[in-house]
Amino acid sequence: RSCLVGSEMCIRDRYKDDREKIGLNIAKREKRKLIKPFDDLHVIYGQGTAALEVVNEIDTKFDMSIVCCSGGGLAAGTGIVLKNIVHNCQLYTAEPKNWNDHEKSFIQEDIVSIQDKKYGICDALENPKPGEITFKINLALETKGLSADDKYIIEAMKILYDEFDLIVEPSGAIGLACILQNREICQNKKIFTILSGGNIDANRYNELLGIEDG
């Protein structure tokens, strides 16, 4: 659809190519400004508006926030909003177990990179380390990290499909997956989370959920 309106699509190999370097090269070649997907204050503020819309519509003081996390922009933007409204709201990032760089970084209070890159079902969250700007914000907000195994991610996708008629990709269901895997800290809590994205091939979705064609 993007190509139909004149856009040029750049295909990359997720296992070999560096998407940031590709973007920088295109921006340099075409004399354009590169807008980073998370490590940019304007982007972070924009991502925070999702939380702002929720708190403006729902008269609820959340105890916890568990937000899907790749580079940390959505978590940072959400955290800024929630902490300014509910000061004692505990913030968490949600990541797949093999890509829990934020969880590890918060423990160390310094940026930790994933070295053993085991690619899984949450391709949108497979960023090896937190952003410089986002990490400073999240650390200042006293954010902590949670992570989930694939079985909980798939369980979350099934719940969203069966109970809410929602088709959500693995990366988008990671917040609910972390709730399911960390029930002991989530009991009797009012929790803010975001279900983000349905970008998954139909055959792959059915395969993960065990849905037979036809």
Question: Which residue stretches match the model-derived regions?
Answer:
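A cross-family phosphate/adenosyl-ligand binding-site feature
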Residues: 14-23, 29, 43
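Conserved acidic residues
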Residues: 8, 32-33, 63, 143
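Active-site-adjacent helical/loop segments in soluble small-molecule enzymes
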Residues: 62, 131-188
